[in-house]
Amino acid sequence: MTKTSSIRWAVGSLLAVALLSVLAPQQGRGQDAAKPKLYNTAKQKLLEGKQIFSFTQSKMDINGYCESAKHYDFTWFEMQHSTLEFKDIEAMIAACPHVAAIPMIRLPDAQEWHIQHATDIGVLGVIVPTVDDVDRAREGAKWSRYPPVARRSSGQGQARSIWGINGIDYAKTINDNMLVVIMIETPTGVANAFDIASVPGVDVVIIGNNDLAQFSGYAQTDDRYQQMVTKIHDDTLRAGKIFGQANWTYATGHPLSKDAKFFQNGPSNDGWKPPAPAGRVP
């Protein structure tokens, strides 16, 4: 290679490096822009380290639901302790499908058909009560997402038409947007908390505060109760999952409040308060 050729080669190499340094950031920005943002806004807030609160819907009331859902992060549809049916929840979600609060259901059980019905009607979160062991946690996770990560089957419910809009491919995005919440409510669950929280597909572990007090026999003010709360907290964070408590009064003023992110009920996002039940003074 002549001296002139060597100079040309060196200059060409420098130009190529300079060009790549200019293009690379542009390509990175393009890839970031192409990555879809979660339409599960409640989950997005959790991933950003924020607390989320809900309104509990325990009866069929389309107008009431559509009003309350304007003001909260998510709606906690209560099926464990109510007579609500899936068709009721389906109708409420359909009436105002893109209201602010993300629909989630506390299931009566973690059987396949419960979770399949819930996901097909359009919820973006399932809450599994009274999880004592890994097997029940696995059931909750297994039926909530599509293969290859889980075993949800492909149904024909309204979920696709609700969330598969504006160019969004529901089947390709729902796994990331789904939220699987596990409730620990017994001393047995406390003992197994780390293994439960470590189950793949479990996103959030919350304490069922009232039932934990009932099943343990310790008042929530008892140090032994608080030790159980601390163990669940520590095990959940050690497993890399999000921690929460059903009792929203633990959102502030408690030693673990800074780490507690997911709550049943609590303050609305804009100061709105639900109307008092008939016959009860607000």
Question: Model features per residue range: what roles?
Answer:
Residues 28-282:
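Expand to "…catalyze enediolate/carbanion chemistry for C-C bond making/breaking, isomerization
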